[in-house]
Regions:
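Long, His/Glu/Asp-enriched segments that create or flank divalent metal/ion-associated functional microenvironments
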Residues: 577, 584-586, 591-596, 604-628, ...
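Periplasmic/extracellular electron-transfer cofactor-ligation site
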Residues: 30-53, 112, 116-123, 382-397, ...
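Sec-dependent signal peptide recognition
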Residues: 1-9
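Catalytic cores of secreted or luminal carbohydrate-active enzymes
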Residues: 100-120, 629-636, 640, 644-645
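Primarily short, surface-exposed interaction patches in extracytoplasmic proteins
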Residues: 220-296, 304-584, 620-621, 641-699, ...
């Protein structure tokens, strides 16, 4: 029976009262967990009873309650004997256990609804338009205090009511602050957490902060190099955090060299930088500019873009892979505006050889995949959850999912003259995306910002690209600013960087807003964004904690050590050891950052240390974890062992050059850790080299130890 039939039946019942399914009963089922994934909201439901996940489709759930089992879940004659009351109260066996207590407010509401005729209600007037939560934030001077939230839902008909007991609550960091089913926040330790409050498709986020109970905090003003420092310091002062000391010159040079070029500084560069008596900030700024002008800057960032754009010969063929990779390098070398890069990718047509951006559409041929990749990569929004149902933690709906996918409905591909070549073209007929529920053809529509359908005289993808890259699009500049920040600090201001949503708030909203505006105002200049970040004092802070920031990992009060990427480790080992890598398809002395795709050096050191296969555009595909296999590879793997023992390598040259023990120790420290050894380190290493036996083996042992140290393996 159609929903309209139920509404007519309910309307015919004399004395139809105020309680309705859509406004009163569905929220109860959501609250007690009936519509959760492990229960009846799962893909196949539970024990023959299927409901929509988290109640995103109340009409479906109403039909399931009313008609499944031939309507036996409700008892119109004796409402209290209805299965939907007997099972959750465990009056008869129920796999989900007790979900309702007899005579509880929830029980009484459902019983009243049944007694009054089980009306569905008016879905329009019952729609929640706004959710107010009081207080809007909670700030505790020390761990321990609690706070009861009050949640008020506002409806389309202008009414409102207290739904504190029906709202759903989650804490982003339960170890910092937890929240009860009734909306009571309890602070547990120093830190910050976001409380997520959900009710009938609406979500609100409450920020909770608990200061340390430690006494004696006093803010110490520090220099501010740009607006980043101002906004980071502002929050640190509020949270009773003190920043770590500034990096030493050697620490800064190693960090910024790796971050900008993917390569460590040479011993000669380290010595020159340490001996440069120019004013510190001016000297560092000059080094930043010098590094960004090097070809290695392009090589390094080409690796990152190659990951995101899935430059992989398995998907693109050899010629397509090389063409796409070269286009990326050229775009970075000329500092092509980011919005222009994205427009070229999204609107590409023609040969994947002659017009390399067309390769972007080659691995995203299906409209849904093209849309998901585009939104996740360029907006930081994961639409995939809205494919089967409305997004449970965001405003995106299933209708929006398929309307956005419709922009790519006309994309077609056909073979080119070469066996690996493909031609991307626009289909003339039959280009449509249909809704899986009812089969209706979806009209292309933007997610937000315009009432227009998106159909434009310049074409669907051109219209999408125009909307996507607009300065009025709040996600476009923000997503890249946040992603870029993560490359230098180990995590984004919003993290994961490609999962931007209301329920995943930024750790520093003002900072992210300022970065976003600056990037947009610069006309999406990627080099400007990078230079601004690394020129900040915040970026140049040391990794050693103080008593006030020891447990801080969110507010950028200190540098967080980051394990070198696979390519950085591989190149770092060979540079430290003075060895050269030769591969058939690459020029002599190429580095790992020159490798065009994961097939070069496949199955070896690079893959062990997390090089991605480039099967997705998710940052998560590149692993930065530390594993036992990696530890064993470092200890006795062939990559390090062969590099250290190379007869043409650094150790051999130092010995053949007649260097003293001190000179050997200093050179090995400079080439691996990119700093001079401390006095104790120098004394110990010289003693070790002078113990007798094979001096070559002892020098190799020293280099091996340095390459296995955290000072080499991490960028800190």
């Amino acid at each position: 029976m159609r929903l309209a039939g139920f509404l007519m039946m309910a309307a015919a019942i004399p004395g139809l009262a105020e309680v309705s399914y859509v406004k009163d009963v569905q929220p109860i089922f959501n609250k007690v967990g009936c519509t959760s994934g492990p229960c009846h909201g799962g893909a196949k439901g539970k024990n023959g009873f299927k409901m929509s996940l988290r109640g995103y489709d109340p009409e479906f759930d109403f039909r399931a309650v009313m008609t499944d089992l031939s309507g036996r879940r409700i008892n119109r004659t004796e409402p209290a004997q209805s299965l939907i009351l007997l099972k959750p109260t465990m009056e008869i066996p129920h796999g989900g256990g007790v979900r309702l207590e007899q005579n509880s407010p929830y029980y009484k509401t459902i019983l009243q609804w049944l007694s009054e005729g089980a009306a569905y209600g008016d879905p329009v007037s019952s729609q929640v338009t706004k959710l107010d939560v009081d207080p809007p934030e909670f700030f505790a001077q020390k761990p321990g205090p609690s706070q009861q939230l009050k949640v008020v839902a506002h409806y389309a008909d202008g009414s409102s009511r207290d739904v504190t007991g029906l709202a759903l609550y989650n804490s982003s960091i339960p170890t910092t602050a937890e929240i009860s089913e009734d909306g009571v926040i309890k602070t547990l330790r120093k830190g910050e957490a976001a409380m997520l409050v959900r009710y009938e498709g609406r979500l609100s986020v409450i920020n909770v902060t608990a200061l340390s109970d430690k006494q004696g905090f006093q803010w110490k003003p520090v220099p501010e190099f740009n607006y980043i420092d101002t906004l980071v310091n502002e929050k640190m002062q509020r949270l009773h955090l003190l920043p770590s000391e500034l990096t030493t010159d050697a620490e800064f040079l190693r960090r910024v060299s790796l971050d900008l070029t993917g390569l460590p500084p040479t011993p000669e560069e380290v010595r020159a930088f340490l001996n440069d008596k120019t004013e510190n900030r001016k000297k560092r700024t000059a080094m930043i500019d010098k590094l960004m002008a090097r070809p290695e800057f392009v090589n390094h960032w080409s690796v990152k873009w190659g990951d995101l754009l899935q430059v992989n010969r398995t998907k693109l063929g050899d010629k397509g892979m090389w063409a796409f990779r070269d286009w990326i390098r050229e775009a970075l070398a000329e500092n092509k505006p980011y919005d222009k890069m994205v427009r070229e990718l999204v609107t590409a047509k023609g040969s994947t050889f002659q017009n390399p951006p067309a390769n972007f559409l080659r691995f995203t041929k299906e409209p849904k995949l093209a849309m998901e990749t585009t939104t996740q990569l360029f907006l930081g929004v994961r639409m995939v959850c809205a494919q089967c149902h409305d997004h449970p933690f965001e405003k995106w709906t299933q209708n929006q999912y398929f309307s956005l996918a419709a922009f790519f409905a006309g994309v077609g591909t056909k073979p080119g003259s070469d066996s690996e070549e493909e031609i991307v073209f626009e289909k003339r007929d039959g280009a449509e995306v249909t809704h899986p529920k009812d089969g209706r053809v979806m009209t292309a529509k933007f997610l937000f910002g315009s009432e227009k359908s998106g159909v434009h005289e310049v074409g669907l993808r051109e219209s999408l690209a125009e909307w996507l890259t607009s300065k009025d699009n709040p996600f476009f500049a923000q997503a890249m600013a946040n992603r870029m920040w993560s490359y230098f600090f180990g995590h984004g201001i919003i993290d994961p960087v490609d999962d931007i949503r209301a329920s995943n708030p930024p750790s520093n909203p003002k900072l992210l807003a300022a970065l976003t505006k600056d990037f947009s105002d610069s006309n999406f200049d990627l080099k400007h964004l990078i230079r601004t970040i690394v020129s900040s004092r915040t970026y140049q802070l040391g990794f050693k904690p103080n008593e006030w920031n020891a447990d801080d990992e969110l507010n950028f009060s200190k540098a967080l050590p980051r394990r070198l990427s696979a390519e950085e480790l591989f190149d770092g080992v060979n540079i430290a050891a003075g060895t050269k890598v030769q591969l058939k398809e690459l020029p002599e002395e190429s580095k790992a950052q020159d490798f065009p795709d994961p097939h070069v050096g496949q199955g070896g050191f690079l893959d062990v240390f997390g090089r991605p296969e480039r099967q997705t555009s998710c940052e998560c595909e590149r692993r930065s974890d530390v594993s036992l296999v990696q530890a064993l590879n470092l200890l006795n793997g062939s990559t390090i062992a062969d590099a250290i023992a190379d007869s043409r390598g650094r150790v051999s040259k130092l010995l053949l050059g007649g260097k003293t023990d001190r000179q050997i120790v200093e050179e090995l420290y400079l080439s691996s850790l990119n700093r001079m050894p401390e006095t104790a380190e120098l004394d110990y290493a010289q003693t070790y080299l002078g113990r007798g036996g094979s001096r070559a083996e002892r020098a190799q042992d020293l280099l091996w130890a340095l390459l296995n140290s955290n000072g080499f393996l991490f960028n800190r």
